[in-house]
Amino acid sequence: MPIDHFPSSTRYEPHTNATFSQRYFYDDSYYKPGGPVFLYIGGETSGEYRFSNLQTGIIQILMEATNGLGVILENRYYGESCPFASSTTDELRFLTTEQTIADNAYFAQHATFPTIDSSLNAPNAPWILYGGSLAGAQTAFSLKTYGGDDGILWGGIASSGTTKAELAYVEWYDPIQKYGPQDCVGSINAIIDKIDFVRSTGNTTAVREMKAIFGLEALENDGDFAMTIAFPLGGPMFYPTNNWQELNWNPEYNSEDFWDFCSNVTNLDAPENITQIDYSLAQHTNGEPWTNLGNYANYIKKHIVPLCDGAAIDSTACFGTQNESYWAETSNSGSRSYLYSTCTESGTYQAARPYGPPLISRALQVPYTQQWCTWAFPAGEYNSIPATPELWRYNKYGGYEVVAERLARIDGEQDVWLDLCYHSSNAPGRVTANAEEAEQHPQLLITGAGHHWDSYGILDVAAEPQFIREAHRWEIRTVRRWLDEWKGKRQSGKSE
């Protein structure tokens, strides 16, 4: 794969003609001559992590329904598909949205499959992309740039595709506020509000006392403390524990951690030594107790603090983030690649709302995350990161309104990333007026679903929960229409 698809762009100077090895994995179990190629975009992880999509998930479902070939393409700078031996700021300059989606088109034109006798290269075979989350956005961007009747890519499904970039993404916590157990949500909102009040007083003794209740007095930085106690909900950027995002209809991938957390926070049978903690900081809030503080703190001490496995609480091996040299480590890693993309183009820093019920402390704002960018990517000889992400480079594809032929959009109603997706509450209402529009702009919001829940399967669509089952049937119908259209255009082209 070419490292640089844009030799005329000053953005990538000095240019290189070098190539790199980009891994892909394919399954021809269902393939029959004339069938489509389904390209699963690997996104921000290694290719192996996506194998379930070929084995039981959405690609398996579509392959079986259409006699297709399934392929997973590992994204550049992830897994073993790294162009360089390290990831300095200069070496990362080729990690951009436009280079990544150019990989997808180039791969479709040049890929080989040793067990298949004939060539399946685009545009002589119908290539249909699928991606979830960031890869869902890349699917949409790929179709907009390289799709169409005369393009390279024939169609694509963007699942929970985060096509909109914002600097601060405060909406991440909205589904928890709305759909979480309200006695749990209300307790956390009130506790966090009190924590922020104590912080605002500047009373360092009270702040240290407050942190000590959670077993986190060693964390001098308020942001580090705030992020650590937010982990059961989903801490900004890092998720060392499962949270709302890991809820799943498929038992093999589901986690009960969020429900266990809320059950602990609202425990009516907590012993007195725990419930008395609710009053330990009341002197700082006009005598008002901090309802369920003891339960919340007890959960953090029992389930979060032990994750450090003996490391110092304020170290980067635990919950400290204030070590500049830690961030400047240039070894290749998925987390470094993802951070670079976040810092340069996509932003979307999880942050607390400045007003109203917070769920997470208002210590968690854009500057807290932005400082990691500054430390991680010092200016190189050829490349430097912007002071804040250049969101326009990501949003130029259309944001909520990415327009492309044969682009299907599917989202989950309770997804924490929903407000960056097509069905965002900040986007226009999504109502399909007629059958023609349904074919031209296929879209579906899955009731009660989370983050790209349609990507999971159990090898029996009929046995799935009804809203997932019907989502998969909708995707099959959508793809079949695209393939009928492909055959029709091919036949008309031959007859001309």
Question: Model segments located where?
Answer:
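Alpha/beta-hydrolase fold nucleophile elbow
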Residues: 117-134, 138
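Conserved acidic catalytic loop of the alpha/beta-hydrolase fold
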Residues: 102-124
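Catalytic-loop region of hydrolases
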Residues: 1-69, 80, 94, 477, ...
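C-terminal subdomain of alpha/beta-hydrolase-fold enzymes, centered on the catalytic histidine
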Residues: 237-495
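Loop/turn elements at helix/coil->beta-strand transitions in domains of secreted/extracellular proteins
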Residues: 34-37, 66-70, 124-126, 149-154, ...
